[in-house]
């Protein structure tokens, strides 16, 4: 087995699709028919993607629903679970869960036994590495406040925060080497503000002065935007803290990090005005500590194709709608001539535009497989021949 394919895909509200599949006959039966077309198309896209290990964002809530969904969407794959019907051991809120699927034929051929890292282990490692700043999976973060009486932003306050969706880490031994794949879904949850004092006042034009005026006229919205970025940035920092702890345990751990990393609207504006870091920067680490720096699987993918979603940024209309939200990163132990037994070679990463568009060309936009395109990387087993 000279190589295997690792992929990440946000399948967009799989839990809702599963619920629609269970709609009975009657006036709403059209929902079931649409869901059947959608999940069959998702199955076709997963089949064409042909990943050996697939990380899924926005999967169904809980093991029982996930098993039911993937039995239809990903036949031939095994869902890696914690054998926890309560779901508590996943540390995930909401209905958008994170799942790893391993192709059955790959598991057998590679002779691996994949499992999920206990959250207790993750939390113990981050607590140690952070010198106690993180404890029991929670940490302090300074969040801005908004005074509804005055309509002005107030002083920041320290609050305890934790992962909304705790990262799930797939672990297995490959020819004597421990491999870890950290799956994440970081996403701001503030955009649909119903409070009139926290609404966004759209700019009169894309000119910077008009955008600046809109930001000044929307203090409640901007407060929520900065608050959301602070939360997700702290979650990214916790992921990086876990990775740093692994480097404190061995000189060159073999770690992948992949998933949907969404900074939210107004990414560059929020960073420039409020001096916050982008999430990928937090995750990659400090380039001055090069051995710990994470490489990006898409760094040499053509610029014009290096995007996975199309969104109009309501805060910054100057921003190009083609945005890379889905990422695959990996440690230095997986690249270069010294990498063994697995190596990520140049040109191995890809956004799967062709497969995604081919499958969705047969569907109405209302039931497209997803608003995200899958991303993937081919990992070469250099122990079986020339690297």
Regions found by a protein language model. Name each.
Residues 222-251:
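A long, amphipathic alpha-helix that forms part
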Residues 62, 108-111, 120-122, 145-148, ...:
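Metal-dependent phosphoester-hydrolase catalytic domains
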Residues 59-194:
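Structured beta-strand-rich core segments of catalytic domains in phosphoester-bond hydrolases
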Residues 21-25, 70-73, 197-198, 270-278:
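Short secondary-structure boundary/capping segments
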Residues 3-21, 179-208:
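Short, solvent-exposed beta-strand-terminating loops
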Residues 1-99, 210-217, 231, 236, ...:
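N-terminal, active-site-proximal structural segment of metallo-dependent hydrolase catalytic domains
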Residues 27-36, 224, 228, 297-298, ...:
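A short acidic, glycine-rich active-site loop
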Residues 11, 59, 186, 260-261:
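Active-site metal-binding loops of divalent metal-dependent hydrolases
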